[in-house]
Structures are given as C-alpha cells and as structure tokens.
C-alpha cells in the first residue's frame, strides 16, 4: 500500500526534483504540498497526482489566483502562516518532506516530529538554528529524520557500512567535501569584486541562486559541518571539510578496526545529482548502495589524494560560520542566517558587492543582539526579530564602512 507524503517547499529546487521522482513512485501518494507563491511552477505537476487533496500557498493573492484557474481546489487551498500546521494535522501518518528554505523551516520540522511523522529533511537551517528543540522532540516522540543533503546522506551510508562490517571499530573523524564554488580558481585579489554572473556559475552542481552564492562563500559548508555535528552527535572539531573539485566523493568516515589493528576509511562516491540524496531519503535509508568495482576504487583513491584543505584567506566565511555557532549557539544562528539571506538578496539585486556579504556577517558576529534562551514559546519571536534585524542592517550604510 502506498504511503502518504506531503512536500513542503514544493516549487523550490529540492521540492521540484522530489516531485519529479514521486510522479512515477509506487511507494508514495502525494496528498499535500506547500509553497510560497509560485503556483505556475507547480501547475505542471497536477496531472500526475490524482490523490493530491490540499495545497498551501502562503501568499493570499497567489492562492486566490490559483483557485481562479483551478476551481476544483477552491475548498482545499489554504494560505497564511497556519496553513502548513492545518495541512499536517489532516494527515498525521504522512511522511513529511521539508524542503522549505531559511529559518522558517524549523516550524514544520518540529510539527512533524511532534506528530511522530517521518521527516525527510532538506532544510538544513532546522539543525543550524533549532537543533536544541529538535533533540528535545526526538527524546519524546518516535518520528525519524532522514537527511536530504549529499554530504549527510553520504555520512549515513558510511556509518551504516562501518557498523555492519566492522563490529569492533573506533570512530576517529568525519569528512565532508565542497566543490569550492564558482570562484575557486579566480585570483584571490579579484574575489572581493566578483560579479553576480561569475558567482552563479557553479562548477559541478545546479542549485538555487541563494545556495550557489553560499557555495561561493562556503557559508553553506559551515552550516553542513554544524548540521553533521548535531545530527550525528559528533563534536565539530572531529568533522573536517575539504575541497573535492569534481564533487563525486561526498563524505568519508575514518575509523580503527581493532580486530585487525588497522586504521581505515570509508567514502561515499556518487554522481552530482540531488536526486540521489532525495531517493535515499524517500527509501528511508533502505536504498541499495552501489557496489564498487576496481575502477571505482581507483577513482575514489585519486579523488581522495586530491582533497585540498579549505583556504582561510579564500573562504573566511566558512570559519566565521563555525565561530558564530560556537559562540552563540542556535540563538545566534537565527540572526547570522537571516543576515546571510538578506545580504545575498541584496547582492543578487546589485545593491551590494560580493565582499560586502562578508562584511555584513562579520558585523552580526561582532554586534550580536542580546539573546534569550531559545524555546518553543519564543521561536516565532526569534524568526521575526532576526528578520527585522537583518532587514534593518542591510538598509544601514555604517556597517559597509567598517
């Protein structure tokens, strides 16, 4: 019997690819979706999902326009901030795929965990800003979290393989990889003034503009180290990130096999395609792994030998991101991520230069507002106040002169 699934962030990069996979799935039936406003990007999916009952469109005007084109959904389209909560309450047994971007994604993450629902999680901010709340929920409720991120899927596969085949092992450390982004070969003296069209030319992945900029600064890789630390309960200093130019080796686990007294490593090697990670999450970790042949082993070894440390001069924001989390925890990351998002929006709108993304983030780390302890009671306050802070900061001129 097909399992019910709800896709949140259905018109974004991950959500759209998930729907492409679900069109031909015998394992799932799509019963609900949610997105902000871009209904025209979603309409092409309607013929494929005859069990789709409810649609959440956050923007009221866009919701009304959608209904005017699709009157059959007139009573089944919700808008406003409570729409997702209503949708999840209608299907308490459904699997939830959360591909919402930004700080807002933490709310449906917590709702799904509260409902004991399995959560396929592409919203990395949930761990970055809300890991303390997630851990509390996971102590009480029975839902499972399956990551949708090539690095964390890779780590999951490696850890599973090591625990299955090396019973007497001692974990040493983890590695996740980065491509280095679009500016990795640009002379260092030219990076600060990099143009939008150059920053958006990702060398290996096809992603949203926001994530592509985060790849150029490696803010996203800082987030992924934090996410891995919180997800697998491993200290940040035991997780390294390195440059793998082809993005074919996504992650690795280093361990000691005490049975043979050897230090070994297990790497995950797969194409640069987010559908690999999405498929693994949809299978809830049961998707069979590719069995390597001799050519694969040689290729992996070649890539591993070509790993390069992350240069602090070229990628200072990778280190600043980790510093912010170490200093301010989840609470400070609300503000850091909100400023990063607003700064990228300003850069893409040609309102600030590339190097000013770094200046804005340095400013928030050095001028963090007074932080109260994060709780469910003040969660929405954190989201709104960090949004206001970021908007006001980007409208100021003073920080740009620092």
Question: Where would I find each of the regions flagged by the language model?
Answer:
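Catalytic, metal-anchored helix/loop core of enzyme active sites in primary metabolism
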Residues: 1-402
């Amino acid at each position: 019997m097909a399992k019910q699934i709800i896709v949140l962030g259905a018109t974004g990069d991950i959500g759209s690819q998930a729907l492409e996979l679900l069109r031909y799935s015998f394992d799932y039936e799509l019963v609900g979706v949610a997105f902000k406003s871009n209904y025209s990007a979603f309409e092409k999916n309607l013929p494929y999902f005859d069990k789709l009952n409810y649609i959440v469109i956050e923007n009221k005007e866009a919701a009304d326009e959608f209904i005017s084109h699709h009157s059959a959904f007139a009573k089944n389209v919700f808008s406003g901030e409570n729409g997702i909560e209503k949708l999840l309450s209608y299907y308490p047994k459904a699997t939830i795929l959360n591909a919402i971007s930004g700080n807002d994604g933490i709310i449906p993450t917590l709702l799904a965990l509260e409902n004991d629902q399995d959560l396929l999680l592409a919203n990395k901010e949930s761990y970055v800003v809300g890991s303390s709340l997630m851990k509390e929920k996971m102590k009480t409720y029975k839902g499972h979290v399956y990551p949708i991120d090539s690095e964390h899927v890779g780590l999951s596969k490696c850890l599973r393989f090591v625990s299955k085949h090396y019973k007497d092992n001692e974990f040493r450390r983890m590695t996740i990889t980065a491509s280095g982004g679009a500016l990795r070969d640009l002379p260092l003296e030219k990076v600060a003034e990099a143009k939008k069209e150059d920053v958006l030319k990702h060398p290996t992945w096809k992603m949203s503009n926001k994530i592509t900029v985060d790849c150029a600064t490696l803010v996203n890789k800082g987030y992924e180290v934090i996410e891995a630390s919180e997800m697998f309960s491993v200290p940040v200093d035991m997780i390294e990130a390195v440059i793998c130019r082809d993005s074919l080796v996504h992650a690795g686990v280093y361990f000691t096999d005490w049975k043979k007294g050897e230090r070994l490593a297990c790497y995950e090697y797969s194409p640069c395609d987010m559908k690999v990670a999405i498929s693994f999450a949809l299978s809830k970790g049961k998707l069979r792994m590719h069995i390597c042949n001799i050519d694969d082993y040689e290729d992996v070894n070649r890539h591993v030998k070509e790993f390069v440390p992350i240069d602090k001069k070229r990628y200072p924001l990778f280190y600043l991101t980790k510093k912010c989390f170490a200093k301010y925890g989840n609470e400070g990351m609300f503000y850091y991520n909100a400023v990063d998002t607003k700064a990228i929006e300003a850069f893409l709108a040609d309102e600030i230069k590339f190097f000013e993304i770094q200046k804005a983030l340095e400013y928030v780390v050095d001028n963090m507002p007074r932080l109260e302890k994060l709780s469910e009671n003040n969660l929405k306050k954190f989201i709104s106040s960090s949004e206001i802070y970021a908007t006001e900061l980007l409208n100021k001129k003073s920080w740009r002169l620092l």
